[in-house]
Amino acid sequence: MKRRTARERAMQALYQMDITGELEPKVAVENTLDEGEETNEFLESLVVGFVDNKEEIDAAIRQNLKKWKLERISIVDRSILRVAVCEMKYMEEIPHNVTINEAIEIAKTFGDEESRRFINGVLSNIKDTL
């Protein structure tokens, strides 16, 4: 599984967990996989990394939102931001610009017309604080 695919699957897993409010991370990851597709370590580390550090990740996002509340952001955009911030804060071997570019590409696929600019702005602000 390519890293872009793993990031997309992680975003989808966080989306499911956000909607249901009670889905276990392992189940959410399994729900994103195609039939016969296996998970990988990167995907699982993104999802578990978010679950283990949810308060810190959400706080970093909240501190960099202008005129928005985290709860008012679309679930898709919130999930993309959470995956990207998890990667930026806890996977130091991945350059922040790569993470931001990947998040923008995922936003182009899954978000609305404003998503990519919004996500780019928030993540760029977070990058400056790390």
UniProtKB/Swiss-Prot annotation:
It comes from the Bacteria. InterPro entries: NusB-like_sf (IPR035926), NusB_fam (IPR011605), NusB_RsmB_TIM44 (IPR006027). Keywords: RNA-binding, Transcription, Transcription antitermination, Transcription regulation. GO terms for cellular component: cytosol. GO terms for biological process: DNA-templated transcription termination; transcription antitermination. One of its GO terms (molecular function) is RNA binding. Involved in transcription antitermination. Required for transcription of ribosomal RNA (rRNA) genes. Binds specifically to the boxA antiterminator sequence of the ribosomal RNA (rrn) operons. HAMAP family: NusB. This is Transcription antitermination protein NusB.
